[in-house]
Amino acid sequence: MFDVIAFDADDTLWHNERSYRDGRERFRRLLARAGVELDDAELEARVTRTEVANIEFFGYGVSSFALSLIETAIEATGGRVAARDLHAVIDLARDMLAEKIELFEGVPDTLAALSSAYPLMLVTKGDLLHQRSKLERSGLEPHFSYVEVVSHKTPRVYEGILARHGIDASRFLMVGNSLRSDVLPVVEAGGWAVHVPAALSWAHEDAEVPDHARQRCFELPSIGALPGLIDALSAPAMARPRAAPPAVDSPRRPSCVRPVRL
């Protein structure tokens, strides 16, 4: 059923968002030393607003995050932020760039199993040097036949990747934690997607899945369940996994189909 299986990296293969949360906490303490007291919600709102506004100019990643923190510090202090505090933000960014890569449980075994049967692709957004460095340090690079580091994940970007590698969209599967980046644009481009929600995620990556997209995406509790799902999808139609109906008392429908039998 699939010719290529692609994976997101950050918060799909390895932990990432908690590094940014730790960075925001360090930044909150920095602002407090500068005389600006913000609670967690206000800090999150300010930093996220600045980050999202800057995506168009600086893209995603630690460098963009650090620039957004510096801009937030200037605004929050009315331009009175000290040079030493700006330097502390730079140190924070350097620490984030050098952090040890911690894989999610089941990732090495899942990639080893799938790479023996399918060409695997990594499609990750962010800073090229940092993403390449993380992939090398993760020990996962040998599993991937293709690596794509992009600035944004849109239907057009995915269409370009598929065209460049001669991949039929209907035989392409993308696996990731972000509905906005890994699921919806792939489905719109004609592919299939698996949503593996992460315990921690950036609010900007949340999105609603329209009804027409639900039957081309699946939701799994962990990446370790992926080989079983792919085996079931590749089996004859009678053996394919059934979708779990939405719970009657659930305030929110599942974003994608949740297989109940693999």
Model-derived features: where do they sit?
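A metal-dependent, Asp-based hydrolase signature
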Residues: 37, 46-95
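Active-site neighborhood of HAD-like aspartate-dependent phosphohydrolases
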Residues: 1-7, 12-45
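Hydrophobic alpha-helical core bundles mediating ligand binding, dimerization, or RNAP-core interactions
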Residues: 23-31, 47-51, 89-94, 131, ...
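Conserved phosphate-coupling serine/threonine residues in phosphotransfer and NTP-handling enzymes
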Residues: 124
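Asp-based, Mg2+/Mn2+-dependent phosphohydrolase catalytic module
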Residues: 1-2, 84, 108, 112, ...
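Glycine-centered short loops/turns at secondary-structure junctions
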Residues: 117-118, 190
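Short helix-capping segments at alpha-helix termini
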Residues: 33-38, 78-80, 139-142, 166
